[in-house]
Design a protein with these regions (language model features):
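Juxtamembrane/disordered regions of integral membrane proteins
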Residues: 1-80, 84-135
């Protein structure tokens, strides 16, 4: 679980820093009462990429630490990681209100296809990590 949480925190921080960069360096519009703002919206296509890279790296670290990793363990790990992420996201980004929280519609409808691609990336991260252990 340690590797999952480290990856999750890193991906979240990268997304936040990317948004801040867009707002302050590229002078994109920040969030307002109507939307999350241009600075955030322009980061969305990058979110699956952050996730596939980071979760593959941490999937590799996790799988490489096992005495005899198998592809079945990689699939199980991917399923566990994406399940935890889905549940945590509901609380962390929708239910618990904060300046960057979203509504259910914003997170699960308007964030398409990105959220689906993110969850696929998290699922396959340990699988790709396992494949890297074979090299």
């Amino acid at each position: 679980m340690l590797w999952f949480w480290i990856a999750y925190i890193i991906v979240t921080l990268i997304g936040i820093l990317h948004t801040i960069f867009n707002i302050y360096v590229l002078h994109m519009k920040p969030m307002d009462k109507e939307s999350m703002g241009e600075g955030y919206e322009k980061t969305k296509p990058w979110h699956p990429l952050y996730n596939i890279v980071i979760f593959t790296v941490f999937g590799f670290i996790y799988m490489n630490g096992l005495s005899n990793p198998t592809i079945a363990e990689a699939f199980i790990t991917g399923a566990i990681w994406v399940s935890i992420c889905i549940v945590f996201d509901v609380f962390g980004w929708v239910i618990i209100k904060h300046p960057w929280s979203l509504t259910f519609k914003q997170f699960y409808v308007e964030y398409q296809p990105w959220i689906t691609l993110i969850y696929i990336a998290i699922f396959i991260g340990p699988i790709l990590g396992f494949l890297l252990t074979l090299i």
